[in-house]
Amino acid sequence: MAKKSESKKTKPKSAGLMTEVAVENLAFTLGRKADIDEVLRQAGLTRQRLSVLMVDDEIAQAMETRLDAVLNAPWRFIEDHGEQTVFLKELFTRWHAEIVSGAWEACPYGYSVMEANYALTSDSKFTLNEIVVKPLEWFEPKNDGRLIYRQNATEVDVNAKYPLKFFLTRRKPTFKQPYGDPLLSKLYWLWFFR
């Protein structure tokens, strides 16, 4: 009697769905570049989740102190172009705290996006009506300077479609890291193991 050949049951090889390559490929397929910040990658965090560090009293106090220093720094316009300079000085004086605070958000998170809403004055001039910081997860900075809005399966180049509507501020961006360098990612492991 012939011996039955035993078929060796083996598991199929994994396609590596949990590897960085798979995650990067999925992100590329979806159109969003994977964040290459090493700390965020190792911790499994998104940039928005760095906000948990702001709950720490020491970190929050240090960030607030630095923001206050920036807000209280003197500013001036170098060139004088007459009526336009006067108009811009009035505008910047009115919106100084909102503009500087919104741009400063790039320090802890690497980048920030502000949306400006305009109004028409009685003497037919466009002026700022509102300027607000928008959520990081809605936008993707590109290494060529473009800003992409991603929401509800849509992708819009906001600089092309809405010029002077959205303002991107980045901290130390590079070609490889267009999202900028977030300060809070450097504190993450120190905070986590405290």
Predicted regions and their residues:
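N-terminal acidic, proline/glycine-rich, low-complexity intrinsically disordered segments
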Residues: 1-9
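Binding/recognition "hotspot" determinant
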Residues: 50-53, 58, 62, 66-69
